[in-house]
Amino acid sequence: MKRIEVSTEIGSLSVTYQKQKKMLVCLNGAGLLPSYENFSLILEKLPPTIGYLTIDFPNTGRSPIHDQAGKNLDNLADAVYKVLEELAISEYILCVHSLSGILACKLLKKPIKCQALVAIEPTTKKVMFADFSENPYPEMEEQMRLIDECGPELYFKNLTQETFSPEINKEIWELMQEKGSELENLDTGFQISGEITEE
């Protein structure tokens, strides 16, 4: 496993990878969680012939703080594509979670062709701009009740403790607390993420 930082228009991106001809490119959803740790249970199961690449977007995981004012989804897609080019990736499977579902739609139009797309709970424009007054996700009621009952941080801590080894769980929380502290100390005009519009 190697870690590098790639300088892009949206800021420096922390990239974790193990190079092979065929690559699994994993992109996180919103939140502070580092991508490598978030996808570690999948990455551990890959055969040695398949490499992997995870990218921490600005202000998440191991990537440094960088103001995203004036940035948008196209800028983020261009930044991810720059990482693919820099690492000379020519064949890849894209594995996205949540908000990166929208990003996947942009990446699929780029010249380096994606062989397959695996979308885990993808967010799409239809989901982002949906009317939630009719509760379109009844299966999430229990999850929302638990979050309300114990608070989001405790709920998430319990979830990561059940999912990850003690070592990885500790590293996840150390990184998230460090990033959270950095973000709390920023000016009020600082923009954490780029804009996503209906276009």
Identify the function of each model-found stretch:
Residues 54-93:
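Active-site loop/oxyanion-hole signature of alpha/beta-hydrolase fold enzymes
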Residues 109, 115-149:
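Flexible "cap/lid" loop of the alpha/beta hydrolase fold
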Residues 41, 106-107:
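Active-site signature of alpha/beta-hydrolase-fold catalytic machinery across serine-
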Residues 9-62:
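Conserved HGGG/HGGXW glycine-rich cap/lid loop of the alpha/beta-hydrolase fold
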Residues 128-131, 147-199:
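Conserved alpha/beta-hydrolase catalytic His-Asp/Glu region
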Residues 36-38, 63-69, 128-130:
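Conserved catalytic-core motifs of eukaryotic protein kinase domains, centered on the activation segment
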Residues 96-100, 104:
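Gly/Ala-rich beta-loop-alpha elbow adjacent to hydrolase catalytic centers
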Residues 94-96, 120:
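Short beta-strand immediately N-terminal to the catalytic nucleophile in serine-hydrolase-like folds
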